[in-house]
Amino acid sequence: MTGTVASTAYLLAMLLDMRLTGNRYDDRILWGGYLTDDRTLQKTLGTAIHTSLGIVLAGAYGMAAPFLPKLPGPWRGLLFAEGENTLLFPLVPLMSALHPEVRRGGLPRLGTVEFFLLEAVRHAIYGLVLGTLWRDRE
C-alpha cells in the first residue's frame, strides 16, 4: 500500500509540474509508450507500470531501511528515492535513444538537465511520502 500511495503522489506531482511548467515529460507515456502508440492506452498502461515499479521500489526501501542513516522517516525516504534516481539516471540516454515516443516526437529527448531536475523533484515527493508512511513500521 505504501508504494502505491507514494507512486500516486509522484504522479500527482508530475501532473502539477506539467501544468505549471508546460513540460511534456510524462512518465505514463514513458512506460506505456514502449508497448503501444495509442496515447490513451499508453497512459493507462504507463500508470499501471509506474505504480508497479513504485511498489517494487518501496519493497527495496524496506530491505534497505535498516542500513540507511538514522534520520526521520521522511528524510530517509527522500535520501533513498534520490539515491535511486541518481544511480539509474546514467541509463536514461539509452532509454531516450531507444524509446519509440522520443523518436516519434511524442516525448522530448530524455537525459537532459531539465529532465533530471523534474525527475529529482518527482522522486523527492515519492521519497518523502514513502518515508512518512513507512515510519510507522520501523
Where are these regions (language model features)?
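Short amphipathic, positively biased membrane-proximal segments
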Residues: 1-138
